[in-house]
Amino acid sequence: MTITMLKSKIHRATVTEANLNYVGSITIDKNLMDKANILEYEKVQIVDIDNGNRFETYVIAGEKHSGVICLNGAAARMVQKGDKIIIMSYCDLTIDEANKFNPTVLFVDNKNNIEKLTNYEKHGEII
């Protein structure tokens, strides 16, 4: 038996673009992808903090250190430029693996610069 666990999370990223006419996906700054342990073409869940939308897409790499977070294609209708989003990927692990596993959690500022990288998320409110 396996269980689906949080693998990677980029918390409170700011949407820099929404491009309806691009082939569907989310473009993420390659540096953020590398630090968060997210691969190109990996399936991700997006949660828009501002409007509550939740949806899935896949990742394409954006220019390193550009801060780009761009929703493309149909996903562009789910967000607006400036929205805060949470980007999450998951993995399937056995129970034994899950008990030893820690996710990669990346906190970013308003310009999508890395503020904190951790393997643990303290539960509580962010002010």
UniProtKB/Swiss-Prot annotation:
Gene this protein is translated from: panD
Pfam families: Asp_decarbox (PF02261)
Residues binding substrate, per UniProt: T57, G73, A74, A75
Subunit field text: Heterooctamer of four alpha and four beta subunits.
Catalytic activity: L-aspartate + H(+) = beta-alanine + CO2
Entry note: cofactor: Binds 1 pyruvoyl group covalently per subunit.
Pathway: Cofactor biosynthesis; (R)-pantothenate biosynthesis; beta-alanine from L-aspartate: step 1/1
Organism per entry: Clostridium botulinum (strain 657 / Type Ba4)
Protein name listed in UniProt: Aspartate 1-decarboxylase
Compartments (UniProt record): Cytoplasm
GO molecular function, one term: aspartate 1-decarboxylase activity
Assigned protein family: Belongs to the PanD family.
Any one cellular-component term (Gene Ontology): cytosol
Post-translational modification (record): Is synthesized initially as an inactive proenzyme, which is activated by self-cleavage at a specific serine bond to produce a beta-subunit with a hydroxyl group at its C-terminus and an alpha-subunit with a pyruvoyl group at its N-terminus.
Known EC number: 4.1.1.11
Any one of the GO BP annotations: alanine biosynthetic process
Record-annotated active site: S25 (schiff-base intermediate with substrate), Y58 (proton donor)
Pyruvic acid (Ser) carried by residues: S25
